[in-house]
Amino acid sequence: MNKIKCALIGPGNIGTDLLYKLKRSPVLEPVWMVGIDAASEGLARARELGLKTTADGVDGLLPHVKADGVQIAFDATSAYVHAENSRKLNELGVLMIDLTPAAIGPFCVPPVNLKDHVGRGEMNVNMVTCGGQATIPMVAAVSRVQPVKYGEIVATVSSKSAGPGTRKNIDEFTRTTAGAVEKVGGAKVGKAIIILNPAEPPLIMRDTVHCLTETEPDQQKITESIHAMIREVQKYVPGYKLVNGPVFDGNRVSIYLEVEGLGDYLPKYAGNLDIMTAAGARTAEMFAEEILAGRLTLESNRAVLA
């Protein structure tokens, strides 16, 4: 079967974990890994897996995009460089899946709004953040039952799973996640907090979601909605679990989650990376299926719907 060829930018924790997932994909074929350090472990690992590599950043990839048929690129670098990376690749008709908190394209949380983006012919979609991917489905599960006036999420991840890129982008993480809690989750006001826990052995990713509903919460409907949404997320992140809740206290609905990774590249405690890379891969697969079916054509700076 034909596969859509992909490039990965950023051979760090997220880029490397994503590479393993793309290797299993029925519709995506990773062919390039882009970095900036010739001695990086991630580039060496990509070469071992048969990918072409460059240590000259995106500029090292551009001359090969057309020849190697690259149609989708994943950016797992940093919010600071993403806009330029996206501009250069969009011009060549490459669809960009943004795994940084840059958020220049629309937010995408697969179980909530992935289908909308595929039908709009976007050239850049943003995967929010790991905390956003884990918690926004829960905010959306409450807000689809009744209006949420405030949504707050707290993502706790092990220090070991947060590489230099994540640490550089902490402020962007909180801003981008809070924005997506509102735009995708449906809360009128959103707030996001990230905690890096240095405990050894490293702790699994844990997330807490608090929603304040405008009227008294319909406990049965909200509980059913949350359980249905958990099942949707588990389709691509099997280690996504409801640990406690929903707990109702007046108008507050609290949900406690745990995310265990598949252990593709980093150990299973790094569910924060896993949910991000799984969501990115799921999103790209959805676009790839549309391209393969002839319903979507990528051109310079635009995606044309059939």
Swiss-Prot record:
GO terms for biological process: catabolic process. It is an enzyme of class 1 (oxidoreductase). SMART domains: Semialdhyde_dh. Gene3D superfamilies: Dihydrodipicolinate Reductase, domain 2, NAD(P)-binding Rossmann-like Domain. Coiled coil: none annotated. NAD(+) binds at S161, A162, G163, P164, G165, T166, R167, K168, N169, N272. It comes from the Bacteria. It catalyses: acetaldehyde + NAD(+) + CoA = acetyl-CoA + NADH + H(+). The active site is at C130 (acyl-thioester intermediate). Its EC number is 1.2.1.10. GO terms for molecular function: acetaldehyde dehydrogenase (acetylating) activity; NAD binding. InterPro entries: Acetaldehyde_dehydrogenase, Acetylaldehyde_DH_C, NAD(P)-bd_dom_sf, Semialdehyde_DH_NAD-bd. Keywords: Aromatic hydrocarbons catabolism, NAD, Oxidoreductase. The keyword RNA-binding does not apply. Pfam families: AcetDehyd-dimer. Belongs to the acetaldehyde dehydrogenase family. This is Acetaldehyde dehydrogenase 2/3. It comes from Azoarcus sp. (strain BH72). The lineage of its organism: Bacteria, Pseudomonadati, Pseudomonadota, Betaproteobacteria, Rhodocyclales.
